[in-house]
Amino acid sequence: MEPSHTTSNNDNILRTINIQKILFDKEQFIPLLSIADPSVNMIQSYLFKGELYILSSNGQAISAAVIISVGDKEFELKNLSTLYNQQKKGYGSILLTKILELYSNADKIWVGTGSPGINKEEFYQISFYKRFGFEYVYTIKDFFKNNYIEPIYEYNGLQCIDMVYLSYTPSHHNKKK
């Protein structure tokens, strides 16, 4: 893929952003993917059956996304991660925007993300996806307790307990353009 964006950071340094589909040596990106999913076994369960996209800036891999087919014209975004020191700078948004463009002919795109299982508490990831047009669909109670050996804690100290699924329907958003 060609460079998709040129942007400036807070220091007004011009940066070139590249988004590339990775076909070989995907395992080299497991450390980056493990920022969003700490289970290497879980990452390996979807990495090699999915499409891996890497966003890099000035030659450094900053964000990664894995999307898999889950049915006829339905896909699931299994992982969207950004280096800790690069979070909240727009890289994840740029990569997600590109993914949504690439899969604009899909009937539906799903994403599952963690929740603390506490009423009126949600992690920033849920509002992040909602900003892009994802809508809440359902919750799998105790998903992280039942599927991960070690507890997973978010930046705010709350434990991931439930898996919250959201969906995005490209045709609803393509009409708005």
Where are these regions (language model features)?
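Conserved acetyl-CoA pyrophosphate-binding loop and the N-cap/start of the following alpha-helix
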Residues: 86, 90-98
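Conserved N-terminal entry element of GNAT/NAT acetyltransferase domains
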Residues: 1-24, 170-177
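Conserved active-site alpha-helix within GNAT-family acetyltransferase domains
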Residues: 93, 116-158
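Conserved beta-strand in the GNAT
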Residues: 54, 60-69, 74-81
